Amino acid sequence: MKKTLKRILFSSLSLSMLLLLTGCVSVDKAGKPYGVIWNTLGVPMANLITYFAQHQGLGFGVAIIIVTVIVRVVILPLGLYQSWKASYQAEKMAYFKPLFEPINERLRNAKTQEEKLAAQTELMTAQRENGLSMFGGIGCLPLLIQMPFFSAIFFAARYTPGVSSATFLGLNLGQKSLTLTVIIAILYFVQSWLSMQGVPDEQRQQMKTMMYLMPIMMVFMSISLPASVALYWFIGGIFSIIQQLVTTYVLKPKLRRKVEEEYTKNPPKAYKANNARKDVTNSTKATESNQAIITSKKTNRNAGKQKRRG
């Protein structure tokens, strides 16, 4: 539930920041954008689009694709770093789940507000002592750096002179495109589906809402904007899938091994409650869970070795 809340908060934060940065670029009565983000990043991007479209004779559709690819390649390391931080924190939380289970059980079974508050405090203390944080993997700085680029290319794709009257593969870039909207929805659904791979079944059930939320959001935005913007989101969706593939099948396995090695060398300590109503049984369970983590990881590694030999 906490990871679901974290993802919802992260998505809400991303959307809020997108709207905030969109507000930084205003459009005057003549239909010309202005503002700090536009003057700093948007104008150079618009000039690049014009250069590829008119001076190189590639057309505005291809020009938008090229500039979008350039921008996404530039900020891809930031996106991967953000994914690395979030995945590292998630793997650590998964590793510590058996250790925190007795506390979570007390939290679920709490009958009074006092008991619930005590369990929550104990859980947060245990997480803090082991270097864990519910929001530690969000990484706001990389997102803050990326958002101006997203905002600038959004307006460059929409307001570069000549784009609204251009066509690309039979699509009028100045009008809405149902075809691109459907493709974008599929791309972002695939990206959301990939993010659920390798996730425990229990957590996967909690993430189902998020799997549909992003495609729905993209449909509503794409269907109300010109095809030039949808074309930018189409390329962005491809890059999102690439980033998610790297995260799911490259970063996560490496981080899982890294976490296992870290806590094999330095086994995590069981948290001891300091309150007066200390439950000896739960303390024993925590200690047993602490040992169970190491035993479970060793068993999984031995099983993997036997499979490879077979």
UniProtKB/Swiss-Prot annotation:
Lipidation sites (N-palmitoyl cysteine): C24
GO molecular function: membrane insertase activity
Basic residues composition bias: residue spans: 298-310
Pfam families in the record: 60KD_IMP (PF02096)
Membrane topology (UniProt): Multi-pass membrane protein
Subcellular localization: Cell membrane
Disordered: annotated span: 266-310
First-listed, main subcellular location of the protein, grouped into a coarse class: membrane
Keywords for this protein: Cell membrane, Chaperone, Lipoprotein, Membrane, Palmitate, Protein transport, Signal, Transmembrane, Transmembrane helix, Transport
Segments of skewed composition (Polar residues): 281-297
Lipidation sites (S-diacylglycerol cysteine): C24
Entry similarity comment: Belongs to the OXA1/ALB3/YidC family. Type 2 subfamily.
Function: Required for the insertion and/or proper folding and/or complex formation of integral membrane proteins into the membrane. Involved in integration of membrane proteins that insert both dependently and independently of the Sec translocase complex, as well as at least some lipoproteins.
PANTHER family: CYTOCHROME C OXIDASE ASSEMBLY PROTEIN COX18, MITOCHONDRIAL (PTHR12428:SF65), OXA1 (PTHR12428)
Full protein name: Membrane protein insertase YidC 2
Organism from which the protein derives: Streptococcus agalactiae serotype V (strain ATCC BAA-611 / 2603 V/R)
The organism's taxonomic lineage, starting at the top: Bacteria, Bacillati, Bacillota, Bacilli, Lactobacillales
